Amino acid sequence: MAENENTKKRNRREEILQALAHMLQSSDGSHRITTAKLAANVGVSEAALYRHFPSKTRMFDSLIEFIEDSLISRINLILQDEKDTITRIRLILVLILGFSEKNPGLTRIMTGHALMFEQNRLQGRINQLFERIEVQIRQVLKEKKLRDGQGFSYDESLLASQLLAFCEGMLSRFVRSEFHYRPTQEFEARWPLLLAQLQ
């Protein structure tokens, strides 16, 4: 019986988070989302929302945890499965852009647009996530010298920030275009431009 209650509670939590992500994807996402609007969207009372989450901040925390877990775990898989530096970089970029494309509502969180009206701590978590990804990209670039005996013409820190800035720009464009301009759009055409910097 207790197991059924826990499953129901978990399902309701997921339903609330999915509703929030969906609202972030819709035109509601460009404005502050209130718990009243969210409760109406889920079809429950505000009190019911607070039975599952102590605050809206905690809901955003849960969505950010999902973003972190999804990206970092997959980056780790790429690093585990692939040894070629350029292949690793390409796959990491495609992962970030593809994740964004599949999760438009979460992209508003990743770009900070959805967090403008929320606690600063949430933006700090997103900043830390991107810093962590940049560190991983920089490490991949540095390992080339160890593996191949030859590094890049440019400093690895500069290259890592440039590659991540490209991703962040594509994510911002996705949000700005109301999700019409897909982050992976024209990636094949853009890749040689990025690759030219990795000499």
Curated annotation (Swiss-Prot):
<dbReference type="GO" id="GO:0000976">
    <property type="term" value="F:transcription cis-regulatory region binding"/>
</dbReference>
<keyword id="KW-0175">Coiled coil</keyword>
<dbReference type="Pfam" id="PF22276">
    <property type="entry name" value="SlmA-like_C"/>
</dbReference>
<protein>
    <recommendedName>
        <fullName>Nucleoid occlusion factor SlmA</fullName>
    </recommendedName>
</protein>
<dbReference type="InterPro" id="IPR023769">
    <property type="entry name" value="NO_SlmA"/>
</dbReference>
<comment type="function">
    <text>Required for nucleoid occlusion (NO) phenomenon, which prevents Z-ring formation and cell division over the nucleoid. Acts as a DNA-associated cell division inhibitor that binds simultaneously chromosomal DNA and FtsZ, and disrupts the assembly of FtsZ polymers. SlmA-DNA-binding sequences (SBS) are dispersed on non-Ter regions of the chromosome, preventing FtsZ polymerization at these regions.</text>
</comment>
<comment type="subunit">
    <text>Homodimer. Interacts with FtsZ.</text>
</comment>
<feature type="coiled-coil region">
    <location>
        <begin position="120"/>
        <end position="140"/>
    </location>
</feature>
<dbReference type="InterPro" id="IPR054580">
    <property type="entry name" value="SlmA-like_C"/>
</dbReference>
<feature type="domain" description="HTH tetR-type">
    <location>
        <begin position="10"/>
        <end position="71"/>
    </location>
</feature>
<keyword id="KW-0131">Cell cycle</keyword>
<keyword id="KW-0238">DNA-binding</keyword>
<keyword id="KW-0963">Cytoplasm</keyword>
<keyword id="KW-0132">Cell division</keyword>
<dbReference type="GO" id="GO:0051301">
    <property type="term" value="P:cell division"/>
</dbReference>
<dbReference type="InterPro" id="IPR023772">
    <property type="entry name" value="DNA-bd_HTH_TetR-type_CS"/>
</dbReference>
<dbReference type="InterPro" id="IPR036271">
    <property type="entry name" value="Tet_transcr_reg_TetR-rel_C_sf"/>
</dbReference>
<dbReference type="GO" id="GO:0043590">
    <property type="term" value="C:bacterial nucleoid"/>
</dbReference>
<dbReference type="GO" id="GO:0003700">
    <property type="term" value="F:DNA-binding transcription factor activity"/>
</dbReference>
<dbReference type="InterPro" id="IPR009057">
    <property type="entry name" value="Homeodomain-like_sf"/>
</dbReference>
<dbReference type="InterPro" id="IPR001647">
    <property type="entry name" value="HTH_TetR"/>
</dbReference>
<dbReference type="InterPro" id="IPR050109">
    <property type="entry name" value="HTH-type_TetR-like_transc_reg"/>
</dbReference>
<dbReference type="Pfam" id="PF00440">
    <property type="entry name" value="TetR_N"/>
</dbReference>
<dbReference type="GO" id="GO:0010974">
    <property type="term" value="P:negative regulation of division septum assembly"/>
</dbReference>
<dbReference type="GO" id="GO:0005737">
    <property type="term" value="C:cytoplasm"/>
</dbReference>
<feature type="DNA-binding region" description="H-T-H motif">
    <location>
        <begin position="34"/>
        <end position="53"/>
    </location>
</feature>
<comment type="similarity">
    <text>Belongs to the nucleoid occlusion factor SlmA family.</text>
</comment>
